[in-house]
Amino acid sequence: MEVRFAMHPSQFKALTTEQIRKEFLIENLFEYGKINMVYTHVDRVIVGSAVPTVEALVLEDGSQIGAQYFLERREIGIINIGSRGYVIADGQKFELDKKDGLYVGMSTKKLEFGSDDPSNPAKFYFVSTPAHKQYPTEKIDIKQTEATHLGSLSESNERTIYKYIHPDGVKSCQLVMGMTILEPNNVWNTMPCHLHDRRMEVYFYFDMPEDAFVLHLMGEPNETRHIIVRNEQAVISPSWSIHSGVGTKNYTFIWAMAGENQSYSDISPVPMKELK
């Protein structure tokens, strides 16, 4: 498990392009037959992936996080971005098609990932956060999520937001997770942008051709920087940073938040004229 440390915004604005990428961009997440994870000290979130092929993959024990098993004091949200697969949580099997999700509650001792077709495997993206109580493990069908259609073609941001894990749906201790799908010919996300001082966020971009990318904007509103993000890469966004992007074509991204609360209304909009 790779470890990333937190950073003060005054340090961030002095970083080079390569330093920004090293600290905040998560590359090479998906490897066949492996589980990969990054632990960020920003709200102690773990971002990871699993690509099971011939054999199922078992989430490692909790030794790296000071626990007897991985979910001893954690919860986890999982979304499949690949072909059909399954997750087994303490013996209970959940079949997941592409874009289906799963919330697994604290105290689940064993978590396994598998693919129906090893030659065309499932690709599980997951985010885990600390937890203080056990909520029920629950499958999330994208067709049954709360969906909100926003934006317009004239603003190049027509999109649908699907809420997977949130207070009015599948409940959790602190994890909030969902997916945003941009319509064809639409390329902007989260603009006008905002901040949420009491929550961090991770954006994971996918469903892009290999030669496409998203110009992801981050930093304080008056000290913005950018990261070139390609298919199936993620960006860690501290609470002091905006998180917005524009792509060379339309794309999909999974967003996940953790922190002090789960309130969507607890944000600070950033006026467009203040961006620099």
Curated annotation (Swiss-Prot):
Protein's UniProt name: 4-deoxy-L-threo-5-hexosulose-uronate ketol-isomerase
Alphabetized UniProt keyword annotations: Isomerase, Metal-binding, Zinc
Pathway assigned in UniProt: Glycan metabolism; pectin degradation; 2-dehydro-3-deoxy-D-gluconate from pectin: step 4/5
SUPFAM superfamilies: RmlC-like cupins
Cofactor descriptive note: Binds 1 zinc ion per subunit.
Family (UniProt): Belongs to the KduI family.
Known EC number: 5.3.1.17
HAMAP family attached to this UniProt entry: KduI
Reaction catalyzed: 5-dehydro-4-deoxy-D-glucuronate = 3-deoxy-D-glycero-2,5-hexodiulosonate
Gene it is expressed from: kduI
